[in-house]
Amino acid sequence: MEQYLVNTAKKPCAVNFIITTDGSQVPVYIVGYDPINPNTLYFRSRFRITGTEEVTMRCPQSPRMLKIIVWSEGNLPYRLSSVKLLPLNALKSQEPVVMFVEKFSRQAGRLWPGNYTADNVPFTIQYKRNIYTDTGKDHPTPARIHTELPIIQVSKSKFNQMTIPERVIILLHEVAHNFINYDQDSEKESDHNGLNIYNQLGYPKIEAINAFADIMQ
């Protein structure tokens, strides 16, 4: 396991890694997080590396200092020859809804359960310890939007385990249902509309895939 502390200065950036393995499809894990604030992961992904490959993790948001941990599955041999901080030219949205989603996603790990609002944002986030079904069981979804009221319920217990990009795509998906879609009930349309904004903001595609895969499980 290798650890690094990178001065990202709260600016958009990308972190580039050059990784070499002796074997084929060696699973290598890369995690970046805020060492000061709890439950604040900026990225967390697994890559299957063969030979020498470059991996770049995009961070439209970053902490003052980013702690990075890299390791391989089963302690298989690998070499990390470069960790480089790069500028990230991504869209910085001034749209209140998107700014609210990004800020909440960044701070969710340390926020208490409660109601959260923002100026010029047409909905409230109800941050709950857990979301329950009508029968009182733990709901599998990390967030859901009310079909009639401007409320998005978010599970703190599930958001605490998610990366910031995963939180962003989940919230954008829910926002799309009521405020972007032509068909409010269409999951496919919400996926498309949420991903369109997410990609414009510059977040890693692999984190969106991870978020949807976790929900499907």
Which residues does each predicted region cover?
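C-terminal edge strands of extracellular/lumenal beta-sandwich accessory domains
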Residues: 73-92
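Long, well-structured alpha-helical subdomains associated
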Residues: 201-217
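Noncatalytic modules at the cell exterior or secretory-pathway interfaces
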Residues: 11-19, 53-75
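Active-site scaffold of zinc-dependent metalloenzymes
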Residues: 126-164, 175-181
